[in-house]
Amino acid sequence: MAERPRDRLGRPLPIDTAPEDAAPPVIDVTGLDDNAVWAVALDYLDRGMPFHAHEVFEQRWRSASGPEKDAWRALAQWGAALTHAERGNDEGARRLAERALETLESASAVPTCVDAPRVRASCDGLSADPD
């Protein structure tokens, strides 16, 4: 059964949506190394598809073992925060960004390919008081 089409922010579209009107499916990153997973997720972010980046990070988090697992979880939370922000859910974005920061800070290891300062700055911006 084919996966339901989605928009660039991961929202489901009608089943009969033309392929050119839907976002491409999220690629399977099984078997890719950390550098490639990070690069795929950043490409999605650069193309305005934070939901896809979240899904890539979540794939890695769920399959990871060892000291970097929590860092991948933090990245999945960051991707979700960015998705909520793009959807206009500022409160959800704030909460997820705060959770991502906490998870990243408590991670026992962060993959060397991850630009942790970029992630922290982004999360800080999302969790800042809008007033």
Give residue ranges: language-model regions:
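Hydrophobic/aromatic-rich, well-ordered segments within soluble, folded domains that form packed cores
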Residues: 49, 79-80
